[in-house]
Amino acid sequence: TAVGVALETGQTTGLLIGDIAFLHDSNGLIGLARRGADVRIVVVDNNGGGIFSFLPQRTSLPGGQFETIFGTPHESDASLIARAHGVRSCEARTTAELRQALAEVGPSVIVVKADRDKNVEHHDEIHRAVAEAVRGSIKV
């Protein structure tokens, strides 16, 4: 869809996508480099289905079953997949690197590595802070 938007509008278009979705949709990279679509694809690579780490099954399934069934680790390299299709790619390790990569004209795949467990912990911290703020502001 993002490639279609970029081609139809002629405008720079951004796409934020998870690694599993990127792998499923990587055929969209075919011919991208020669189409003239200025699309910047940012791949959040947590080596699997990070969204599923928020499910209760994460802590209730024995052993490595959760990883096998829901985590779906893949060990694929999104940058190599992009380059195989002639699309420029890089890994952004800092905010400055991400900004620099996003500023480059032309189609590109920018990979941002993430840790699934830390992502869940961070969301839990935010959830607790919001809940505390709401409780503090409601007089019951």
Regions found by a protein language model. Name each.
Residues 1-140:
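Thiamine diphosphate
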